[in-house]
């Protein structure tokens, strides 16, 4: 059984309310907490089935919709757009804010983090900026390429995301 709750918290941008979800197991001892960082054009609710399966194993799961994603997208906002300025670090700081909330709620339970696709890159940045804050990390759907390939790939991904955001938001 799962106790699912939704919550909001203020982004590190100081203006956007971020939507989050918390899946807590019922009737099973809590063994760990997993914080999920979703990919581009995704939202945290996509991980519902996965979270419920982990709950059966005693793992609490939590995550939030990053800036410009899911229910964190302000009315009239641009999908998959983090905002102006150094927003990559803002999103990483948002991950840390949720981490702190989870640590406060579960102080004696190992806290782990998982990032998928874009979330894997956010997670990698998080691990560099906030070392020692998690017991384990799962990095999936990620990559490593030479700088030139990454620069070109990021430019292409940004262009594709800009076009796709005009015509489709993932379900």
Language-model features: locations:
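N-terminal cap/lid segment of alpha/beta-hydrolase-fold proteins
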Residues: 1-25
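Active-site glycine-rich loops that stabilize anionic/oxyanionic intermediates
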Residues: 39-42
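Conserved alpha/beta-hydrolase
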Residues: 51-77
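Alpha/beta-hydrolase active-site loop
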Residues: 83-103
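Alpha/beta-hydrolase fold nucleophile elbow
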Residues: 106-116
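Gly/Ala-rich beta-loop-alpha elbow adjacent to hydrolase catalytic centers
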Residues: 115-119, 123
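Active-site nucleophile loop of the alpha/beta-hydrolase fold
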Residues: 138-147
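Residue-level detector of conserved catalytic or cofactor/ligand-binding positions
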Residues: 165-171
């Amino acid at each position: 059984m799962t106790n699912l709750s939704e919550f909001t918290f203020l982004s590190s941008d100081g203006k956007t309310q971020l939507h989050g979800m918390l899946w807590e197991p019922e009737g099973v001892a809590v063994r760990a907490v997993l914080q999920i960082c979703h990919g581009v054009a995704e939202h945290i609710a996509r991980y519902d089935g996965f979270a419920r399966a982990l709950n059966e194993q005693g793992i609490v799961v939590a995550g939030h919709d990053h800036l410009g994603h899911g229910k964190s997208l302000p009315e009239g906002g641009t999908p998959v757009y983090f905002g102006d300025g150094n927003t990559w670090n803002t999103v990483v700081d948002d991950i840390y804010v949720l981490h702190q909330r989870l640590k406060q709620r579960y102080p004696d339970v190992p806290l782990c983090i998982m990032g998928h696709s874009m979330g894997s890159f956010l997670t990698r940045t998080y691990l560099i900026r906030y070392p020692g804050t998690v017991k384990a990390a799962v990095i999936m759907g990620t990559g490593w390429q030479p700088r030139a390939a990454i620069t070109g790939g990021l430019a292409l991904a940004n262009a594709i995301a800009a076009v796709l955001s005009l015509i489709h938001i993932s379900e």
